[in-house]
């Protein structure tokens, strides 16, 4: 793009010495000749008297270099002048001691030893090359059995195993020289060396082509992949067996003297010593011609010692050290949180940093932080020294340091000067999202605590109860520039996850502002006065001043003589030529509001303030918004102080109706108990009805209390109401507990206790009530601790899977899109369309409905908030947008598919790390999610409103409903899925309305999904008016309703097997209940048209737990109840919520009690029972195609015979398996399902996350495809490959005239997707380190260092943000031109790129 000359390459090479990294298996020659500086022959470490390294031992100076700089071992050569000389007496080279960190040695082994990684890591590499099982290999390697290497003249087979007895037999029969059989590493070495990989590869490919069995093909493909890895790489299989072992440099396994003459040593030294001891002993034994049994045992012990060195505990019992602790092997050095990758390469300690406790700094500006003087002196010491030297105050560093320690006056002057314009970074752990590190201008302060601006606390999640923060100093000019331009606090006032302001006033500030902006409480006309009218704002302020309100010396709210003015008095004032009715408080507030926003004349709870800040940013930009935020903070604190709002016990006013409501509730509970005693309802129903009564009481008392405290007394607000309504502290639920009742409590197992706590904290709890409430408090604390760890681990997995998703291009040019609509629950709109489409790119032109001339948004436009409003107001249901799910960028994603950067409202820039932002946005609110699974039994699982009331006038239309007219003339719903719509009355026929609704040609005003048993009070096509009851919902039972007249016959309702008669203890009434059974019975009620039971008209399956309401041979009419299934009888489902549900979704796990879903469109039918499973058939009546589902009898069906189902619709209760959605409905449906399900969890907790973040994670989960037919490509059957690789391979094959491969998409959980990344460095640093490295080494993988993680590990600049390739080139280009053009303009031709 820009001309890159030699100078550029030189600059590049300084910054990055290499741009790829290859890993392979080291051969003996490499270990011996390239890496090693000498052979270690002795196990000794250091001499016990002199403490000097022993010659030829593990710390030998001759091999590894001197222990002191420029000094040989014997002391003959000292000082730098002898540099490079090798001492003729002790053989040590005179050089720096740091070479002891890089020089390696080796141990020459007496016999070949198998590397445990290649043999024990699944799948076993050696096993796959040789075609032998792991157990066979183990017996050979550990000297238990012989293996035939060359059968010679015998009838043995190659690779046949022989035990001692068989071996002796063969020797006796054929003679010792007629065949070759060996044991141990030597045998494996010979077998690997003799393996012809090329012919093996050809043979495997032939077998794969001929094999039909799927299982066998998968097995062959896996082996083929390993063999191909060896063939295509420069590795020889015999290198997996070692003839010499490399020894780590001594300074990486140090021996440190402790006080008292003892030493602390690295475990590696012990492990190496064991290897050397056994190796030396084996060499000695071999020289002495010792008996075979002893030699064999010694060889096995050497193999085990090397195993322990490489991976202790992988084979047999781990080798223990002092205190019975397993020794840390080389593998452990890499693995886990404290391994090399995560401890040292990804998590380094930072110099020029400090930490201290934080306190609030209300006097600071938004971009400032208070830095203690002592801390600043220490952190900026090098800068101070340089400045002091430049000034000529000192000449040496030592004298400058002394001057700083003395605290000379000029030092403080210099420090003040240096700190100006030098930003520092503040960080609070845990850093859950990018707002956890921000840059500030330091202000020097006395004391030892760091001062923080109150408005940035929300971003850091900081409070001042002892929290600590770390300070980091950016040193280089580039780092300072980045901190200033990108990381300053004013640039981070919006959440990257949702675009909502994060820097909003809270607590006292909110209270102060709310108090100032409160509705008028003092009306002059009520006190015999007149409303005061002011000519302008200045006059209002003068009046306030006269009343002492703006004078800090006087603290009376209102001058009693009447000269002054009440802060909440109703007044009139002329503003911008208009007379406005307002209060002095609001006039005071509007002084700080930017003019463009107009006069704010309403109360200001925290939500309103947040909206105002967002509006301010959109209208007047960042700078004015930051000034406004600072003014808000100051005004809020001042007014909160002046208002002096404090809460007293009397402010908690208990509603007078409490006793009446409680009495009524006790009466209702008694009625329910009586119904149970009379046998009308079951125990489950009684429980759920009782709980619903108390829930209702709790809600109505809570509302009554809120109304009570919102009343003003003597024109003053209730302070408690001010605190809650402003959003400063507390909520309705806490208020309910203070002044109404505590309500229902849960047992430790999550079940709800029936009798609620009817006392509140104002009245005080009884001992019993207190003891019940203590469960919840303890559970909360225990949950929080577990939640934090789980949430952190989820974030880590998410970051790992998405870390290489960066914005790599402006526009990928795709034509693909997704369709998006508002999210509704019943008739309620949970998330309007405008919120979902803001900041996304339109995929096709959007016109005003019915008016093609009015274009609302053009294809390729990024939707602004104004456009989003327009589209939503136009009544458009759904629109097509670009998405990262459909982006076709080769690497990363493109800016157009991503849309706006929510943190600043501009189109996302190139190199932006959107993957990590997405992971942080999902992970950061993790701690707010609940950990528990909800135990929702009975009522809570269904809608809790017993009736449906319409809010508008129109015509009622049934859609997808099967109904029957009951005995009372109302319509009863027979199917599980359907809805009733209220549409605008346009005088059309019912058929027309239905047709228009089905084709989405008209919008319904309201939609109510209805389920089985709902009683609809209005007929299909009848008119309804606002406020009319249109349906009743049966809360406590799922009814099974008869839809045809006839006579009852029980089928498979066999007493004692499938049913039981239960005598109600209290009433003596007998109830027939269907029980769970394991027989071949299929309980159902059949309806025959005649009393002779000859003509069958319908059957009804009766689930277990149902109570039968009709008797045999009874005559029934349509709409009659045949049986009822109490909702409490449906086994209490544990609804997995919160964090576990998010983890389940992103890990693509199969839910425990998974639902069955329809594989085709069709009609449901049953075919009896087979092996305790009900056979459900879905038949497509057009094609005649059938799909069978075997459903366990214990599962609850949610469809009936004759129901029409769509592909992907649920047939039974439970959660859907994502993999099935992918298989049946395809990728788009799965993507939609995953995004919506994850959003559902967060929405329940009130957390706002933009869809685009979840889409990025889902994109990463669907990166791979599984090959179903390799065609003429080099891909293998069943292999999982990246889509990019798949398309590339197909393109190459098609160009050569071959047949392309076929594949199906695969859904991977995030852990599996992270491990399957192209970069082996990134995968190894995540999990399964040894397995990943073994796999990579066998195929000589190359890591091109394209992602972030691998570059951090290599110590390179990350290829994102300012390190993105394009930006780096621009930088070089500017550097190159600067020398020639100092103050000249670049001509256009020179600029062309």
Curated annotation (Swiss-Prot):
It catalyses: RNA(n) + a ribonucleoside 5'-triphosphate = RNA(n+1) + diphosphate. Binds 1 Mg(2+) ion per subunit. Binds 2 Zn(2+) ions per subunit. Disulfide bonds: none annotated. GO terms for biological process: DNA-templated transcription. Mg(2+) binds at residues 463, 465, 467. Its EC number is 2.7.7.6. DNA-dependent RNA polymerase catalyzes the transcription of DNA into RNA using the four ribonucleoside triphosphates as substrates. Belongs to the RNA polymerase beta' chain family. This is DNA-directed RNA polymerase subunit beta'. The gene is rpoC.
């Amino acid at each position: 793009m820009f001309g890159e000359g030699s100078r550029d390459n030189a600059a590049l090479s300084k910054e990055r010495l290499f741009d790829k990294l290859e890993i392979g298996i080291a051969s003996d020659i490499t270990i011996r000749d390239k890496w090693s500086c000498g052979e270690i022959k002795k196990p000794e470490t250091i001499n016990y008297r002199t403490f000097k390294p022993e010659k030829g031992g593990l710390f030998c100076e001759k091999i590894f270099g001197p222990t002191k700089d420029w000094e040989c071992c014997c002391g003959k050569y000292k000082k730098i002048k002898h540099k490079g000389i090798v001492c003729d007496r002790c053989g040590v080279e005179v050089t720096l001691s740091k070479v002891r960190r890089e020089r390696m040695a080796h141990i020459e082994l007496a016999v070949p030893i198998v590397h445990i990684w290649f043999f024990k890591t699944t799948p076993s590499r050696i096993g796959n090359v040789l075609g032998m099982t792991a157990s066979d290999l183990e017996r050979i390697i550990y000297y238990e059995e012989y293996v035939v290497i060359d059968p010679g003249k015998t009838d043995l087979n190659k690779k046949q195993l022989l035990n001692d007895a068989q071996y002796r037999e063969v020797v006796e029969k054929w003679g010792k020289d007629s065949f070759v059989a060996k044991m141990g590493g030597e045998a494996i070495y010979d077998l690997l060396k003799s393996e012809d990989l090329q012919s093996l590869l050809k043979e495997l490919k032939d077998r794969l082509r001929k094999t039909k069995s799927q299982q066998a093909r998968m097995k062959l493909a896996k082996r083929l992949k390993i063999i191909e890895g060896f063939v295509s790489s420069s590795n020889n299989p015999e290198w997996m067996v070692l003839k010499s072992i490399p020894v780590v440099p001594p300074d990486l396994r140090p021996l440190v003297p402790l006080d008292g003459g003892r030493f602390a040593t690295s475990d590696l030294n012990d492990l190496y010593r064991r290897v050397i001891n056994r190796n030396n002993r084996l060499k000695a034994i071999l020289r002495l011609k010792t008996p075979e049994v002893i030699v064999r045992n010694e060889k096995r012990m050497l193999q085990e010692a090397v195993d322990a060195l490489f991976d202790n505990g992988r084979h047999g019992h781990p080798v223990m050290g002092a205190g019975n602790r397993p020794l840390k092997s080389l593998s452990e050095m890499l693995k886990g949180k404290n391994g090399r990758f995560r401890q040292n390469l990804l998590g380094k300690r930072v110099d020029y940093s400090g930490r201290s406790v934080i306190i609030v700094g209300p006097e600071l500006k938004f971009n400032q932080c208070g830095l203690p003087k002592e801390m600043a002196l220490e952190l900026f010491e090098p800068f101070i020294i340089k400045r002091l030297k430049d000034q000529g105050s000192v000449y040496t560093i030592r004298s400058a340091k002394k001057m700083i320690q003395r605290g000379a006056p000029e030092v403080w002057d210099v420090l003040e000067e240096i700190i100006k314009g030098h930003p520092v970074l503040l960080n609070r752990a845990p850093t859950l999202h990018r707002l956890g590190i921000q840059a500030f201008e330091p202000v020097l302060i006395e004391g030892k605590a760091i001062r923080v601006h109150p408005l940035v606390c929300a971003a850091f999640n900081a409070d001042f109860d002892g929290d600590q923060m770390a300070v980091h100093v950016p040193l280089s000019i580039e780092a300072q520039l980045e901190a200033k331009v990108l990381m300053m606090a004013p640039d981070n006032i919006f959440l990257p996850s949702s675009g909502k302001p994060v820097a909003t006033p809270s607590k006292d500030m909110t209270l102060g502002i709310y108090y100032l902006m409160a509705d008028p409480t003092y009306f002059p006309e009520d006190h015999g006065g007149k409303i005061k009218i002011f000519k302008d704002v200045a006059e209002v302020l003068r009046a306030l001043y006269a009343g002492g309100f703006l004078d800090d010396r006087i603290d009376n709210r209102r001058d009693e003589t009447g000269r002054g003015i009440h802060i909440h008095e109703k007044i009139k004032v002329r503003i911008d030529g208009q007379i406005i009715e307002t209060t002095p408080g609001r006039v005071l507030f509007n002084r700080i509001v930017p003019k463009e926003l107009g006069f704010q004349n309403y109360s200001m709870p925290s939500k309103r303030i947040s909206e105002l800040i967002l509006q301010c940013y959109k209208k007047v930009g960042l700078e004015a918004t930051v000034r406004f935020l600072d003014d808000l903070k100051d005004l809020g604190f001042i007014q909160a102080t002046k208002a002096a709002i404090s809460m007293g016990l009397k402010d908690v006013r208990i509603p007078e109706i409490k006793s009446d409501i409680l009495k009524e509730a006790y009466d209702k509970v008694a009625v329910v108990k009586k119904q149970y005693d009379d046998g009308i309802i079951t125990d489950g129903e009684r429980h759920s009805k009782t709980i619903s009564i108390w829930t209702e009481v709790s809600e109505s008392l809570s509302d009554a209390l809120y109304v009570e405290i919102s009343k003003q007394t003597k024109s003053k607000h209730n302070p408690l109401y001010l605190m809650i309504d402003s959003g400063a502290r507390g909520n309705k639920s806490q208020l309910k507990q203070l002044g109404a009742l505590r309500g229902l409590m849960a047992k430790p197992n999550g079940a709800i206790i029936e009798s609620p706590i009817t006392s509140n904290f104002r009245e005080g709890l009884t001992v019993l009530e207190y003891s019940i409430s203590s469960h919840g408090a303890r559970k909360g604390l225990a949950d929080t601790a577990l939640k934090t760890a789980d949430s952190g681990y989820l974030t880590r997995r998410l970051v790992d899977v998405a870390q290489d998703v960066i914005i790599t291009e402006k526009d990928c040019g795709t034509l693909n899109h997704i369709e998006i609509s508002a999210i509704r629950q019943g008739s309620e709109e949970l998330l309007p369309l405008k919120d979902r489409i803001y900041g996304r790119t339109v995929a096709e032109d959007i016109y005003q409905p019915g008016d093609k001339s009015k274009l609302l948004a053009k294809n390729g436009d990024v939707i602004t908030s104004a456009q989003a409003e327009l589209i939503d107001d136009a009544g458009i249901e759904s629109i097509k947008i670009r998405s990262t799910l459909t982006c076709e960028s080769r690497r990363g994603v493109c800016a157009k598919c991503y849309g706006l950067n929510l943190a600043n409202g501009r189109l996302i820039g190139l190199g932006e790390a959107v993957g990590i932002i997405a992971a942080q946005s999902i992970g950061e609110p993790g701690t707010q999610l609940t950990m528990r699974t909800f135990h929702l039994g009975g009522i809570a699982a269904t809608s809790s409103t017993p009736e449906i009331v319409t809010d508008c006038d129109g015509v009622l239309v049934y859609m997808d409903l099967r109904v029957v007219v009951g005995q009372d003339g109302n319509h009863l719903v027979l199917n599980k899925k359907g809805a009733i719509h209220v549409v605008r009355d346009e005088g059309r026929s019912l058929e027309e309305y239905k047709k228009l609704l089905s084709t989405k040609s008209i919008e319904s005003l309201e939609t109510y999904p209805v389920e089985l048993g709902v009683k609809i009070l209005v007929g299909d096509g009848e008119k309804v008016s606002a406020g009319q009851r249109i349906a009743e919902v049966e809360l406590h039972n799922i009814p099974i309703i008869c839809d045809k007249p006839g006579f009852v016959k029980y089928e498979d309702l066999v007493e004692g097997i499938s049913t039981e008669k239960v005598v109600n203890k209290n009433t003596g009434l007998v109830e027939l209940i269907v029980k769970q059974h394991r027989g071949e019975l299929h309980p159902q009620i059949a309806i025959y048209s005649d009393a002779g039971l000859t003509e069958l008209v319908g059957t009804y399956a009766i689930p277990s737990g149902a109570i039968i309401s009709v008797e045999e041979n009874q005559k029934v009419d349509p709409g009659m109840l045949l049986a009822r299934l109490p909702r409490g009888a449906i086994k209490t489902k544990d609804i997995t919520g919160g964090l576990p549900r998010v983890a389940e979704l992103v890990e693509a796990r199969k839910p425990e009690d998974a639902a069955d879903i329809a594989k085709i469109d069709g009609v449901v039918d049953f075919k009896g029972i087979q092996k305790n499973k009900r056979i459900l058939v879905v038949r497509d009546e057009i094609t005649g195609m059938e799909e069978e589902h075997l459903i366990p009898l214990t599962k609850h069906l949610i469809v009936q015979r004759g129901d029409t189902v769509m592909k992907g619709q649920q047939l039974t209760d439970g959660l859907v398996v994502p993999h099935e959605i992918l298989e049946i409905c395809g990728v788009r449906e799965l993507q939609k399902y995953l995004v919506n399900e994850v959003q559902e969890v967060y929405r329940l907790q009130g957390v706002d996350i933009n869809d685009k973040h979840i889409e990025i994670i889902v994109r990463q989960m669907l990166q791979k495809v599984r090959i179903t037919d390799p065609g003429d490509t080099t891909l293998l059957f069943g292999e999982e490959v990246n889509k990019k690789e798949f398309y590339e391979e197909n393109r190459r094959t098609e160009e050569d005239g071959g047949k392309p491969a076929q594949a199906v998409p695969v859904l991977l959980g995030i852990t599996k997707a992270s491990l399957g990344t192209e970069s082996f460095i990134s995968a190894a640093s995540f999990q399964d380190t040894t397995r990943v490295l073994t796999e990579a080494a066998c195929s000589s993988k190359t890591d091109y260092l394209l992602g972030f993680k691998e570059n951090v590990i290599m110590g390179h600049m990350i290829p994102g943000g300012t390190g993105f390739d394009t930006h780096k080139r621009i930088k070089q280009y500017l550097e190159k031109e600067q020398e020639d053009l100092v103050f000249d303009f670049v001509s256009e031709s020179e600029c062309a790129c």
